[in-house]
Amino acid sequence: MLSDQSIFDVFSRRIHPFLPERVQPASYDLSLGDEFSVDGRSVLAGSQGFWLMPGMFALAHTVERIEMPATHAARLEGRSSWGRLGLMTHVTAGFIDPGFEGQVTLELFNAGPRPLRLTPGLNAPAIAQLSFFALDCECARPYGVERGSHYAGQSGATGSRLDELREVVSW
């Protein structure tokens, strides 16, 4: 796992925008973007933010665009202050592959008893954090190079590519 100093060294030119105050001892804090997807419908957060009701699931995205080198991977994790209110920032997709480039899609779920107001932007409380890992050597097939890299270069709240297969999802 990378320390704050290594995060500065490796990722200060690979996270856009990179804010030094977002670097933690072993992670980088991420900001919430303004686009949400609820049941496949795109919703922009208004001036009051986006309300995530109890039991509600929505896709969102980070403001930051990440460029992972072929020598590193990352884990997306929630922030404890949000977690204590019942917010999950990812359901199962918390891994960022070497070679990934794009905004990170968040899988938001409110497991708490109260509605949560989520405010997008760099001045709002961080929504999630990335911890980074150095690989033992550069990977031979970084994400985006081969077939199956469905989300390479994604921006915004990107939905599942599996829903294109009618036998997986029923609308």
Q: Can you say where each PLM-predicted feature lies in the sequence?
A:
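DUTPase catalytic domain/fold
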Residues: 1-171
